[in-house]
């Protein structure tokens, strides 16, 4: 089996690949992410995933490199990782009681081909109290997550409904990834 390299330092993406029994190594992409003039959130996440994977693939051309990126959107506003606690609180107040979209883009690169795809998931939050938001932000959990929450952690108590791929919200649409890897002659379902 060809070696897979995850171009990410995300502990969540690492855990998801391990959950799916996909053998991999980590080489963190040091690329400066740039968002150009894209027409849609799906274009943004696929472009960022491709930037990350391409940067690592330059020095690992004999392997399969996997890059991913996740953003949260609400009413055409992109909510990335908060820069501080105040911004995290603002994002959570914005999402309180509303439905937002989570986009995760994935890029898979080998010598032979490049595949990009994305998954879109709708997440609806309960109405959040100021105390709930303050307590959560104080935990520091939201500070390294797009949209300022981790659906797999303490932020799970905010979620009223989800339509789509839960694992995509965590950071990697693992079921779709397994299917896409078959194009690269990697079939983990028989591993």
UniProtKB/Swiss-Prot annotation:
Cofactor(s) essential for the protein: a divalent metal cation
A biological process term (GO) from this entry: nucleotide metabolic process
Pfam families: Maf
Cellular component, GO annotation: cytoplasm
Keywords: Cytoplasm, Hydrolase, Nucleotide metabolism
Enzyme class, broadest EC rank: hydrolase
Family statement drawn from the similarity comment of this UniProt entry: Belongs to the Maf family. YhdE subfamily.
UniProt protein name: dTTP/UTP pyrophosphatase
Gene name tied to this protein: maf
């Amino acid at each position: 089996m060809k070696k897979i390299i995850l171009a990410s330092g995300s502990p969540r993406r690492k855990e998801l690949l391990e959950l799916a029994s996909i053998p991999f190594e980590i080489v963190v992409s040091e690329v400066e992410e740039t968002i150009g003039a894209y027409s849609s959130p799906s274009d943004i996440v696929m472009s960022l995933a491709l930037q990350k994977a391409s940067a690592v693939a330059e020095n690992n051309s004999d392997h399969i490199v996997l890059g991913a990126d996740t953003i949260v959107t609400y009413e055409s506003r992109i909510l990335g990782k908060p820069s501080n606690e105040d911004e995290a609180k603002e994002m959570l107040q914005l999402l309180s009681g509303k439905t937002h979209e989570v986009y995760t883009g994935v890029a898979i690169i080998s010598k032979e081909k490049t595949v990009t795809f994305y998954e879109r998931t709708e997440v609806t939050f309960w109405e959040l109290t100021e105390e709930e938001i303050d307590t959560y932000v104080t935990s520091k959990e939201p500070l390294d997550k797009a949209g300022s929450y981790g659906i797999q952690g303490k932020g799970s108590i905010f979620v009223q409904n989800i339509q789509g791929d839960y694992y995509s919200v965590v950071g990697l649409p693992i079921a779709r990834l397994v299917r896409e890897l078959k194009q690269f002659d990697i079939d983990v379902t028989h591993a």
